[in-house]
């Protein structure tokens, strides 16, 4: 614990805030060729450099689809591809948002379905906005 004299001389310093999705807080200045830390953006655009599957941590078992994405701020991150089936491949342009996948270490971002080169999930009826699925045709009413 500091003494009164130390507090008078130096004061208290606040701890640096740690961000859960740091890549969204950096922006690239093409004129100065520098990356700057800023207020952040809700989404970022990027290009897939690798699309693959990986296995989750201990109690779970699956083949989770992930993509390595090079963002517009020149950072490279690993993002999760939600939903069943996808059309992503190398050089696909995608939009990412923050949000980790608890059982995949190092995956802190999600790819937004239904935007840019990412197709929405086919035949999805519930929670469609999360997966970029269009409203399906309503079933015709039965006649008596």
Curated annotation (Swiss-Prot):
Pfam family for this entry, one: Ribosom_S12_S23
Compositionally biased residues, Basic residues: 131-144
Alphabetic keyword roster: Methylation, Ribonucleoprotein, Ribosomal protein, RNA-binding, rRNA-binding, tRNA-binding
GO molecular function, one term: rRNA binding
Keyword RNA-binding belongs to the record: yes
InterPro entries on file: NA-bd_OB-fold (IPR012340), Ribosomal_uS12 (IPR006032), Ribosomal_uS12_bac (IPR005679)
Region span, Disordered: 125-144
Cellular component GO terms held in the UniProt record: small ribosomal subunit
3-methylthioaspartic acid: modified positions: 103
Superkingdom classification of source: Bacteria
Entry-linked Gene3D superfamilies: Nucleic acid-binding proteins (2.40.50.140)
SUPFAM superfamilies listed in its UniProt record: Nucleic acid-binding proteins
A biological process from GO: translation
Assembly mode: Part of the 30S ribosomal subunit. Contacts proteins S8 and S17. May interact with IF1 in the 30S initiation complex.
Function: With S4 and S5 plays an important role in translational accuracy.
Family the UniProt entry places it in: Belongs to the universal ribosomal protein uS12 family.
Name recorded for this polypeptide: Small ribosomal subunit protein uS12
Species the sequence originates in: Dehalococcoides mccartyi (strain ATCC BAA-2266 / KCTC 15142 / 195)
Lineage of source species: Bacteria, Bacillati, Chloroflexota, Dehalococcoidia, Dehalococcoidales
